[in-house]
Every structure is written in structure tokens, then in C-alpha cells.
A protein has these predicted regions:
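Conserved ABC ATPase signature
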Residues: 128-132, 136
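ABC ATPase signature
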Residues: 91, 132, 145-146
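ABC ATPase NBD coupling module
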Residues: 64-84, 111, 123-126, 219-224
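The feature captures the beta-strand-to-loop junction immediately N-terminal to the Walker
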Residues: 33-35
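Conserved ABC transporter NBD signature motif
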Residues: 56-64, 76, 109-110, 116, ...
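A short, proline-enriched helix->beta-strand linker immediately N-terminal to the Walker B motif
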Residues: 147-151
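Helix-to-loop junction immediately C-terminal to a conserved catalytic motif
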Residues: 48
Length: 230
């Protein structure tokens, strides 16, 4: 579904991503871990076309996409939940969700399934996004990314600043989506236990490069907890 080969990215004179390789498959959660500042968010932005890569290739659904725009990548079936959520504070919950359908016909309805995944959103459709709690905003950001039915969902630290009960709900939704088998999920996460619980495969980054990768079931045996400990 997603294949990243030898991508490099620079910022000024700094080499941010160094020959990064990874794969994400349908029905699997690929977790990317690493200490702060190792290039995880830059990698996700590169996958979305928000940051250009200098060299390397990114293939999605069998086609190279490294030269396409963020809009084209979203339209091809990639959903993105950025760090910090980036919901529209002055728009209602319903309007925020409709932003995920921006390239669909105006008559396209919000998928009812989103309210099944996140029941709280149905109760707050007319509330402004800025009035929601951090956890509710995160659920809204994920719902917005799911609205168009992506084949690849990319999430950047969805548990950051979120209360434990909602972290469990988000984990449940991620696992459910992966288990259906028609979506690949790439998750950057600092919360090790959450990452370990969800990971079908893991990637550990250090100084912009992939330090280790393997089967999620082997994370503890492979010493991943120690690799990412602050």
C-alpha cells in the first residue's frame, strides 16, 4: 500500500531525514517511535507532501506520489491527522467534518459510521470546534480524516495531552479500522504502551534515520522500550 524508499530531506544545512525506508500494508498498524527531534513529524509531513523530499521515492497504491501535491495525495486516498489536531475553532463540529469531504460533491453526506466510532460528536454537531475538550477535538480530527474513506490513515501523536479514557477509545477505533483489512495505518507515537498495544510492525528512528524495525509482537524482546526511553 505504502512504500518509502531511501528518502532524504534537508532544512537549510541540516540533514533531517536520512535514507528512510518503510512499508505500510493494508490491515496493519505501522508504529513509528523515537525520541523528540529525530524526524518523525517531518517524515509524516513528507508523506503528505507538506515538506518536499530531496531524494528517494514514495509509492502509494503502486504509484509514485513524491512529486504530487498534498491535495492530490488526499484525493488519492490518504487521510492525515496532524500533531496538535488543527481543527477549525470557529467552525462547528459538523463543518469541521465536512472539511474532510472538501473534494467530494457538495451533496456528499457525512458517513454515519463516524458517529458510531465517535458518539460524542453526534451530540455536539452544532458546537464550535474551539469549545470542545482536547480529547473531543482529537476525535473530531480523526473523524475529519476518515470522512472521505481513506485507504491510508496517518496519525501524528494522537494521544498527546489526552485523558486516559479517550486514549482507550482512540486505540479501540484504530485497531477496529485496521482489522477490517481495507486500510493501512501509520502512527507516530511517544506513549510506548499505547504504541506496543497497537503495533503490527514498528519502526524506530534516531537522528533522522531508521535505527530498527520489526514485528510489533517483538517490541519488548527487541529492546524498543530502551531505545526510545528519554
Amino acid at each position: 500500500m505504502l512504500t518509502v524508499k531511501n528518502i532524504n530531506q534537508y532544512y537549510g544545512g541540516s540533514h533531517i531525514l536520512r535514507d528512510v525506508n518503510l512499508q505500510a500494508s493494508l490491515g496493519k498498524v505501522t508504529v513509528i517511535l523515537g525520541r523528540n527531534g529525530v524526524g518523525k513529524t517531518t517524515l509524516l509531513k513528507s508523506l503528505m507532501g507538506l515538506v518536499p523530499i530531496k531524494t528517494g521515492t514514495i509509492e502509494f497504491d503502486g504509484k509514485p506520489i513524491q512529486t504530487t501535491t498534498p491535495y492530490e495525495r488526499a484525493r488519492s486516498g490518504i487521510g492525515f491527522v496532524p500533531q496538535g489536531r488543527e481543527i477549525f475553532a470557529r467552525l462547528t463540529v459538523e463543518e469541521n467534518m465536512r472539511m474532510g469531504l472538501a473534494y467530494k460533491p457538495a451533496s456528499t453526506p457525512i458517513p454515519p459510521e463516524l458517529y458510531e466510532l465517535f458518539p460524542v460528536l453526534k451530540q455536539m454537531l452544532k458546537r464550535r470546534g474551539g469549545d470542545l475538550s482536547g480529547g473531543q477535538q482529537q476525535q473530531l480530527a480523526i473523524a475529519r480524516a476518515l470522512a472521505a474513506g481513506p485507504k491510508l490513515l496517518i496519525l501524528d501523536e494522537p494521544t498527546e495531552g489526552i485523558q486516559p479514557s479517550i486514549i482507550k477509545d482512540i486505540g479501540r477505533v484504530i485497531r477496529m479500522l485496521a482489522d477490517r483489512g481495507n486500510m493501512a495505518i501509520v502512527l507516530v507515537e511517544q506513549y510506548y504502551d499505547f504504541a506496543q498495544e497497537l503495533a503490527d510492525q514498528y519502526v524506530v528512528m534516531e537522528r533522522g534515520a531508521v535505527k530498527a524495525q520489526g514485528d510489533g509482537a517483538n517490541m519488548e524482546a527487541d529492546g524498543v522500550r530502551q531505545m526510545v526511553a528519554i
